[in-house]
Amino acid sequence: MPRALWTAWVWAVISVFTEGASDQASSLSCDPTGVCDGHSRSLNSIPSGLTASVKSLDLSDNEITYVGNRDLQRCVNLKTLRLGANEIHTVEEDSFFHLRNLEYLDLSYNRLSNLSSSWFRSLYVLKFLNLLGNLYKTLGETSLFSHLPNLRTLKVGNSNSFTQIHEKDFTGLTFLEELEISAQNLQLYVPKSLKSIQNISHLILHLRQPVLLLDILIDIVSSLDYLELRDTNLHTFYFSEASISEINTSVKKLTFRNVQFTDDSFVEVVKLFNYVSGILEVEFDDCTHDGVGDFTALTLNRIRYLGNVETLTIRKLHIPQFFLFYDLSSIYPLTGKVKRVTIENSKVFLVPCLLSQHLKSLEYLDLSENLMSEETLKNSACEHAWPVLQTLVLRQNRLKSLEKTGELLLTLKNLNNLDISKNNFLSMPETCQWPGKMKQLNLSSTRIHSLTQCLPQTLEILDVSNNNLDSFSLILPQLKELYISRNKLKTLPDASFLPVLSVMRISGNIINTFSKEQLDSFPQLKALEAGGNNFICSCDFLSFAQGQQALARVLVDWPDGYRCDAPSHVRGQRVQDARLSLSECHRAAVVSAVCCALFLLLLLTGVLCHRFHGLWYMKMMWAWLQAKRKPRKAPRRDLCYDAFVSYSERDSYWVENLMVQELEHFNPPFKLCLHKRDFVPGKWIIDNIIDSIEKSRKTIFVLSESFVRSEWCKYELDFSHFRLFDENNDAAILILLEPIDKKAVPQRFCKLRKIMNTRTYLEWPTDETHREAFWLNLRAAIRS
């Protein structure tokens, strides 16, 4: 018994592990190219069952704690492995040994307290390695990256426990495109630790304090192109001229991101610009200046320029003591070589005239998302301000008058590109003054409703997108590019107004269609973006859009941007894919064909009616319906005649001179109903026939060739037949006045043919000796 229990327990454990492995493997989603996604699946281990077909594996943001030697051994073709944001604390020595094709490895934000070079010894082609955010204090006891000759991007360190950088740490690395070191609590930097790297394109350095910054800078200044300093408090930074002045530097760009300055530390940074002579571009992003701009004039007098800095970018600069800030006149002389300045979202409301005049080399100025108005712009763009300025960006400021803005900028003789978008101009005056060399103007998102002659005729590029324009009727003879998207235009502009236009973006309007003729009218048009409009997919438009292969080379957002809005059955479909029926595309031809078919049908119907007595059948049907409306059987007291006599006019002599004499003068006499004598004058013939038959006990049909040719006799026969079959009585008496061949009876006399086949009839004898018997039989038939 215990043996059986032990066996059951073992099988249960195996079953649990098998089900767990199966569930984890099924939690991955893999596409045919071998890209497997296991991101955020609450996995606690690497799924089993991975094969050589897997080329990219994303297991980030899970709860994996351990990477074993066998977990990835079959993934020999794996190129990308993401294990970031897990709980990994242990990686076995040979976990990555079989991943010889691995190019991208992310182990960031786990719980690794020790790093081993054995992990990477077979990763010869690895290009990207991210080890950020783990718990290690150093980069290991041996050279961690010596087996990674092709590594181009490396990210190491953490914000708390990483405190030391040693000389061996980066041995074996010669060239890196990007190196990120997160060392907010760095306490030890061994000189020349970064010296072994011969070239670093971009170094991102997280330092909380600047104590070791200069030591690091000394090692990399000759091999670094771009230094980015993040999350650093530079209040205590001091630049030692002797440390760096004689070194041949290669740094081209310097970025300060989320860095704090004081007035004194800013002066030290400016000194750095001057001595690290290779710096061409400086960027301050989301920085804080804890000072009032009191830059000691004596200190700055020794610095003639901001080194060779040509581009200065300032974004989101915070100045807590903004209202105590100095006029910055002490730094004016340093700005003479600067060519490009961007000061964005920093509450700038004025550029002093004197500073503008000192910016003698400035070609590009961007003051976006600030507080500039016409009143302050007047002082900033004073006489001799920005003498060589070509591009001015005043996007999203507080400008309100287009006329005044243009007038204030007349001092900028070389200005050719002006961006005043996202200001609230609302309207445009009829005339304006602009600098004489204006070629580009951006008026997008300014809420203007119409365009006037205010725009300069020298424009080559105009952007008026995202406004309230419903038409474009300006003559701009030099305009090459027009951006007029997200307005209310219903059609393309007239090409005669824009003779040299080569680029037009007019998406997001209410244009229903455009034609080949319209596009051909723009002789130099090379790019048209017209998607996002409500196209009516008419036959002509679809024929043009789908039949012009060259159209795809002109329409930059073809085919996905072009959707049908009408007709309803193709709404939402791409214009390229929409199909209309033959009746929609050739309506006139279809209507003509239908009319012709109807005419032929009517003509054929007329011919058939004439040939087969169709009119006669319709009259008979009408009479039949009239008869149906009459009571089925008249009461006995309403019977006025013994018999109604139906005969042809050609047989009237026999009826009136023989039959009437024999029946009405017999004793007792029979009362006959004859149409000549008893029909009510003025009453419709059909009604007379119906009434007479219904008021007679019997109906006598005098059959002859003439009877067969008579339509009225046919009606009388039909109504009698109606009584005969619908009322189940013997009302009909047939008298064959002359021999009639049944086959000769016309088809329309179907009832006569039927009666002659089913009932007996009296035949008028040619032998006078038999006539007495004829009359006797007739009287008996009437009485029955």
Curated annotation (Swiss-Prot):
Positions glycosylated per UniProt: N114, N199, N248, N442
The protein's role, per its UniProt record: Cooperates with LY96 to mediate the innate immune response to bacterial lipoproteins and other microbial cell wall components. Cooperates with TLR1 or TLR6 to mediate the innate immune response to bacterial lipoproteins or lipopeptides. Acts via MYD88 and TRAF6, leading to NF-kappa-B activation, cytokine secretion and the inflammatory response. May also promote apoptosis in response to lipoproteins.
Protein name: Toll-like receptor 2
UniProt cross-references to InterPro entries, sorted A to Z: Cys-rich_flank_reg_C, Leu-rich_rpt, Leu-rich_rpt_typical-subtyp, LRR_dom_sf, TIR_dom, Toll-like_receptor, Toll_tir_struct_dom_sf
Gene giving rise to this polypeptide: TLR2
Cross-link Glycyl lysine isopeptide (Lys-Gly) (interchain with G-Cter in ubiquitin) placement: K754
Transmembrane residue ranges: 588-608
Site features described as Interaction with bacterial lipopeptide, chain residue numbers: F349
Disulfide cysteine pairs (residue numbers): C30-C36, C353-C382, C432-C454
GO biological process: cellular response to diacyl bacterial lipopeptide; cellular response to triacyl bacterial lipopeptide; inflammatory response; innate immune response; toll-like receptor signaling pathway
SMART domains: LRR_BAC, LRR_SD22, LRR_TYP, LRRCT, TIR
Keyword Hydrolase: no
UniProt cross-references to PANTHER family, sorted A to Z: TOLL-LIKE RECEPTOR (PTHR24365), TOLL-LIKE RECEPTOR 2 (PTHR24365:SF17)
Superkingdom per UniProt: Eukaryota
Processing after translation: Ubiquitinated at Lys-754 by PPP1R11, leading to its degradation. Deubiquitinated by USP2.
Subunit structure: Interacts with LY96, TLR1 and TLR6 (via extracellular domain). TLR2 seems to exist in heterodimers with either TLR1 or TLR6 before stimulation by the ligand. The heterodimers form bigger oligomers in response to their corresponding ligands as well as further heterotypic associations with other receptors such as CD14 and/or CD36. Binds MYD88 (via TIR domain). Interacts with TICAM1. Interacts with CNPY3. Interacts with ATG16L1. Interacts with PPP1R11. Interacts with TICAM2. Interacts with TIRAP.
Record remark: domains: Ester-bound lipid substrates are bound through a crevice formed between the LRR 11 and LRR 12. The ATG16L1-binding motif mediates interaction with ATG16L1.
Span of domain LRRCT: 525-579
Family label: Belongs to the Toll-like receptor family.
Record-linked Pfam families: LRR_8, TIR
Keywords: Cytoplasmic vesicle, Disulfide bond, Glycoprotein, Immunity, Inflammatory response, Innate immunity, Isopeptide bond, Leucine-rich repeat, Membrane, NAD, Receptor, Repeat, Signal, Transmembrane, Transmembrane helix, Ubl conjugation
GO-annotated cellular components: Golgi apparatus; membrane raft; phagocytic vesicle membrane; plasma membrane; receptor complex
GO molecular function, one term: triacyl lipopeptide binding
